[in-house]
Swiss-Prot record:
This is Bifunctional protein FolD. NADP(+) binds at residues 165-167, 190. Pathway: One-carbon metabolism; tetrahydrofolate interconversion. Its EC number is 1.5.1.5, 3.5.4.9. Catalyzes the oxidation of 5,10-methylenetetrahydrofolate to 5,10-methenyltetrahydrofolate and then the hydrolysis of 5,10-methenyltetrahydrofolate to 10-formyltetrahydrofolate. It catalyses: (6R)-5,10-methylene-5,6,7,8-tetrahydrofolate + NADP(+) = (6R)-5,10-methenyltetrahydrofolate + NADPH; (6R)-5,10-methenyltetrahydrofolate + H2O = (6R)-10-formyltetrahydrofolate + H(+). GO terms for biological process: L-histidine biosynthetic process; methionine biosynthetic process; purine nucleotide biosynthetic process; tetrahydrofolate interconversion. Pfam families: THF_DHG_CYH, THF_DHG_CYH_C. The keyword NADP applies. PANTHER family: C-1-TETRAHYDROFOLATE SYNTHASE, CYTOPLASMIC, C-1-TETRAHYDROFOLATE SYNTHASE, CYTOPLASMIC-RELATED. It comes from Variovorax paradoxus (strain S110). GO terms for molecular function: methenyltetrahydrofolate cyclohydrolase activity; methylenetetrahydrofolate dehydrogenase (NADP+) activity. GO terms for cellular component: cytosol. Belongs to the tetrahydrofolate dehydrogenase/cyclohydrolase family. The lineage of its organism: Bacteria, Pseudomonadati, Pseudomonadota, Betaproteobacteria, Burkholderiales.
C-alpha cells in the first residue's frame, strides 16, 4: 500500500480563491477586511513568515500591514500599540508574530488583543470558545488540519484519533476539534510511555512535537490517516516533518507531506479567520 497524498498546497489554493470571492463581496458593501501584523525583533524565520502572511493577504484582496519594531521595544509600548489597534474600526484582525523577545510576556501580549480580532486564535477567550463550542476563532494550524480531513471526506465519528503533542497552539486545540467531531481522542506527549502502543490503535494520527521521525512505519496501523504538523531542518538544510515520510507512506492510507502539507493550510486559515472577523464586525 502506498498512501494517498493530502496536498496542502492545492487545498490552500482553493481556500484562498473562496476567501477572495467573499472578500470582494464584502468590499462591495463598503467593508475592506484588514489584518495588522506586528513583528518585534529581527528573527529571520519570523521575517519570512510575516512576509508570506502579507503576500497571502494582498493576493486575496485583504488589506494587510506589517509593523516592525526593534527587539528592545518595551512591553508597555507593544501593549499600547495593540490597544490602539483594538480601538481602530478599520482593523479586523491583529497578529503578533511569535516568538517575542525574552523580556516580553507572550501570554500577556496575546491577552491584550481583543478576542474579536484574535485571528491567530490564541487568546484565552478563543480557547474557551473552542472548549465549549461557542463562536470564536480556531487556531490556524489545527483548523487547517481539520480542513484537510474534511477534504478527503473523512468521517471522524467513532474513530480513534491520537494527537502527539500538547501545546496550546496545536496539540490541545487539535484534540478539542477532533472531539467536537465525535472522535475518541488520546493525547500523547513527552511523558507518555510506549507511544507506539497508542499510535498502532489510531485511525488518525496528528504528529505535532517538532521532533524528526517521532512516528515511524512500525507505529502506524495500515490505512491510518497521518497528519504531519512538524517543521524541522535536516542536516542538508531541507525541511522535514515529525513523521518518517518514506516509511510511513507505505503503511498509511492518507498522509500529508512536509513541505506542502499543513504549512500552506495554516496560512490559508489565517485568511479565513481575518475575513470572518470582518464579516462579524460588519453585521
Amino acid at each position: 500500500m502506498t498512501a494517498q497524498l493530502i496536498d496542502g498546497n492545492a487545498l490552500a489554493k482553493t481556500i484562498r480563491a473562496e476567501v477572495a470571492g467573499r472578500t470582494a463581496a464584502l468590499k462591495a458593501k463598503g467593508v475592506e477586511p484588514a489584518l495588522s501584523i506586528i513583528l518585534v525583533g529581527s528573527d529571520p524565520a519570523s521575517q519570512v513568515y510575516t512576509k508570506h502572511k502579507v503576500n497571502d493577504s494582498t493576493e486575496t484582496g485583504l488589506a494587510a500591514t506589517l509593523e516592525t519594531y526593534p527587539a528592545d521595544m518595551s512591553e508597555a509600548a507593544l501593549l499600547d500599540r495593540i490597544r490602539a489597534l483594538n480601538d481602530d474600526p478599520k482593523v479586523h484582525g491583529i497578529l503578533v508574530q511569535l516568538p517575542l523577545p525574552r523580556h516580553m510576556d507572550s501570554q500577556k501580549v496575546i491577552e491584550t488583543i481583543s478576542p474579536a480580532k484574535d485571528v491567530d486564535g490564541f487568546h484565552v477567550a478563543s480557547a474557551g470558545a473552542l472548549m465549549t463550542g461557542a463562536p470564536g476563532f480556531w487556531p490556524c494550524t489545527p483548523y487547517g488540519c481539520m480542513k484537510m480531513l474534511e477534504s478527503i471526506g473523512y468521517d471522524l465519528r467513532g474513530k480513534h484519533a491520537v494527537v502527539i503533542g500538547r501545546s496550546n497552539i496545536v496539540g490541545k486545540p487539535m484534540a478539542m476539534m477532533l472531539l467536537a467531531r465525535s472522535a475518541t481522542v488520546t493525547i500523547c506527549h513527552s511523558a507518555t510511555q510506549d507511544l507506539a502502543a497508542f499510535t498502532r490503535q489510531a485511525d488518525v494520527i496528528v504528529a505535532a512535537v517538532g521532533k524528526r521521525n517521532i512516528l515511524t512505519a512500525g507505529m502506524v496501523k495500515p490505512g491510518a490517516v497521518v497528519i504531519d504538523v512538524g517543521m524541522n531542518r535536516k542536516e542538508d538544510g531541507k525541511l522535514a516533518g515529525d513523521v518518517d515520510f518514506d516509511g510511513v507512506k507505505e503503511v498509511a492510507g492518507w498522509i500529508t507531506p512536509v513541505p506542502g502539507g499543513v504549512g500552506p493550510m495554516t496560512r490559508a486559515m489565517l485568511l479565513v479567520n481575518t475575513l470572518e472577523a470582518a464579516e462579524r464586525a460588519a453585521k
